[in-house]
Every structure is written in C-alpha cells, then in structure tokens.
C-alpha cells in the first residue's frame, strides 16, 4: 500500500482487517491501485491470495470529505447491485457491504468484483479507435443494456421502496427549475446565460406523457458511465449508480440520446467516443432499445428534451460554484458550454418532433 495516499492506505488496512473478521479473506494483499473516474467516490482495486485461491476485489466508499448524503448514496448503490444479481443487466457483482461507520471512522463501504473493461470517457483502446464497425455496435450495446435495466421488475427484486414513482414526470420541471433558481445563492453568479430555459420548460409541461410504467432508472446514463469489453463492443457493466431511483426508465434512453453524437454538432460532453465517428445514429439506438423492450417509445423525444433540460441545469451548477470560488473556473466554463449546447439540442429536438427533423 506504500504508493497509495496515507489516508487511503490506512483505509485499506482497516478494510482487510474487517474482511478477516468477517471470514471474507485472509493474508496479505497486493496489486493495489486506485481507480479514478468521473466521481469523487474512492475506489481501490486489490488482490489477495487466500486458502480458496486468488481473488481480486474493488473497494468503493464515499469521497474523502463526506457530504451529508455520501453514506446514504453508497448504501443505495449496494441495494441496486444486490437487486441486479440474478438479472441480465451488466453490472459489477456485489461481494460484501459494511454499514458500520466505526470500521473506517466515518464512511460505509462495499466490496465488488472487478470488471475487465474500459471507460470510454478515459479514451479508446486501439481496436475500438481503429474500427468503426466496433464503435457502431458500442452504442447499440448501450441501448441493449438500458432496455434490460428498464425491463427488470423492481418490486420482484426488492426495490419497491427505492423511489417515489407516483408523480415522477410531473415533478421534473419544477424540481429542476427550483435547482436552477437555487444557484442565485452563490456569490458573483449573475444568473444562467443560457438560451431557451423557459421555452424548454413550457414545452415539457405541454407535451408530458400521460402515463408511464415505473422501473429502475440509472439516472445518469451516458457513455462514460458504462464499461466496455476490451475485446469487442459489448457493455460489460453499467457503473456509477449514484443517481439511481425508481422512476421512468425511458429517461435513461433519453439521457443517452441527449449526450450522444449528433451530426454537425459539437459533442455535449468531452468524450473521445463522441468525436471519432462511426457511431450508431439516434434512430438506430431507439430501434435497438425497442427490440428489447415493451415500452411505448412514441414520445421518446420528450425524454430526450427532459434529459437536456435536467443535465444542462446540473452542469450549470458548476458555473455558479466557480463564480463563488467553490469550483475551478476552467471546469465551470467548460460545463457551462455543455449546458448551452444541451439547451440548443433540446430546442432542435423540440422542432424536430414537429417537423420530422433532428432528434
């Protein structure tokens, strides 16, 4: 553990002692490395040679400076992973959970099996970078995985109380307009310099689907929140379940469409996969989802616009925090550009839903 930061090394020592007490493994650990990603949550991969052979594990806990909800979010993730154990949804298998904060002093944590794959948000291996046919299938595999998640009976897998689906769609516009308004509390933030906020909100209210079938939602379903096979296009795991809940699973498909490559437009999120070409079109993604789902996709444009609206407001929060000195200015500026592009895309989809143009 020498190459880890001292606090993480101390955490790992406590975790391995806990594993021994729980009968989860004995002996020294090796091949230790921190896994970095788009989240502040801490993940450390390590291996252990025990009496039953070699085992590799991943430790996941909240960030160094825990927020009030950090432990709750981590434990919610474990509920989802446990619920998915006997489904065909690609995910990292859960091994063990520690809800006792005294083990680490402040944080709950869990152990999962590692997934052999790569995150497209961190770059593409040679195979995927060089073969457009592989990249084309990557998006279709993402649509497959989203459809499988949306098809899970959340009540049957123990998640009946995991969210509040009643009134879920009605809550979205006021919830996120309220979030945008809350940014005014940040010093030196002049307000959102984003076109179309009111127009998009009004359109969403007027075109809201009349009903939906509740299910498990990932909540942040884009190409950097899945792991792809290193040897092909398949999604081997959906990761980062921090925003998961019970709601309308079609929001995950909408989120994917909102953040996907669009011909002639700048990428919404910085991601190499979105810039190299050869990707499936939005219509192909919808068609593949439909092949694996019984859900009504006739209003999928609404879900894509909602995703643009919601994600745009979330990203603008970094601009507001940057204005107050609570986030790096360069990050705030980059994410503000993404927010503007998302609202531009929302208005293009709104026009296209009437004229048959761009999604």
Write out the residue ranges for each language-model feature.
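ATP-binding pocket architecture of kinase catalytic cores
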Residues: 32-216, 230-232
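Catalytic-loop of the protein kinase fold
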Residues: 216-218, 223
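Active-site activation/catalytic loop segments of kinase-like enzymes and analogous catalytic loops
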Residues: 251-293, 307-326
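All-alpha amphipathic helical-bundle segments outside canonical DNA-binding/catalytic cores
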Residues: 164, 295-307
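Hydrophobic residue at the +6 position relative to the catalytic HRD Asp in the kinase catalytic loop
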Residues: 226-228
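Helical subdomain adjoining the active site within ATP-dependent kinase catalytic cores
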Residues: 295, 299, 313-359
